[in-house]
């Protein structure tokens, strides 16, 4: 896809990831300014905040299909077996680890997270505690010492038997958590995932396992840490010969009843007010996804920086995986891991 943008051979209408705007069109050269077709594409159905997130180089280069964020999901059946309610706070979660180990066994954990999940939860924790965004104006807002605090928090979850080690997850032999037998049978009783992922994880559970939406924790600090992001966008190629027709198609899919019914919530809870109303009026929303999405968007204070998801950081050979795996294996202490993380992030931001 990146080659098609570079060579001008991309389709007229594109479904893109949000960070593609900054990756492929930081100067506005790849995507058409949708403000030019606002007489056809009804932009009033989208919040100013959401449109601003897609505005780069003073051009509205895409329109958001949906917004998403991270939240906890729990296997209530396993918590019931442990004699516990599902966690409403960080304190509840920390207390659950030893209870799971004592009452259910060493293989049971209240929560399971891979390296990228851990990075996001660490950022939630730090933003809650320190009250500032992770990155702002293309600059990392946290010192190595503050990040070390966040890494120690992640280590404390392992130490308290709240989450399994990376080695344990690797030994499970599953390519992803939803395909892990320990998630399927309830031995891993929680995940920290995008609100739109509910169906995938619920569908993977064995029969009889009850899956519920959790809460955003408010006892990590005085601020509401965490972030929402545009989960997916529609964009028009800059070199299109048919901008009006492209705008009409996007408006049909996002704002008009017939098109909205086709899309439903397959790509998340609609960011368009008109689209959301159509889905609500026609019972087209997955109830758990809708519940999770409303909780996330009501809680978070911060926007995700688009470079947070840069390949050099989030891919399995990237900085996040190196840092979190190294910390879990004991290859790095928190100070070393913080230095590596800062260096890797600043390298991406400075490109």
What residue ranges belong to the model's regions?
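Extracytoplasmic "Venus flytrap"/periplasmic binding protein-like
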Residues: 1-46, 77-88, 181-190, 204, ...
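A structural signal for short loop-to-beta-strand junctions that line the ligand-binding cleft
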Residues: 3-4, 11-12, 41-78, 109-110, ...
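A local structural motif
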Residues: 9, 83-85, 137, 158-173, ...
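Hinge/lid segment of periplasmic solute-binding proteins
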Residues: 17-70, 146, 212-215, 288, ...
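Short helix-initiation/N-cap motifs at beta->coil->alpha
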Residues: 18-19, 90-94, 167-184
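Mature extracytoplasmic/periplasmic domains
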Residues: 30-33, 196-199, 216, 232-314, ...
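Glycine-centered hinge/linker elements that transmit conformational signals in sensory
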Residues: 97-98, 139-171
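C-terminal capping/gating helix-and-loop segments adjacent to ligand/active sites or protein-protein/ligand interfaces
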Residues: 228, 290-349
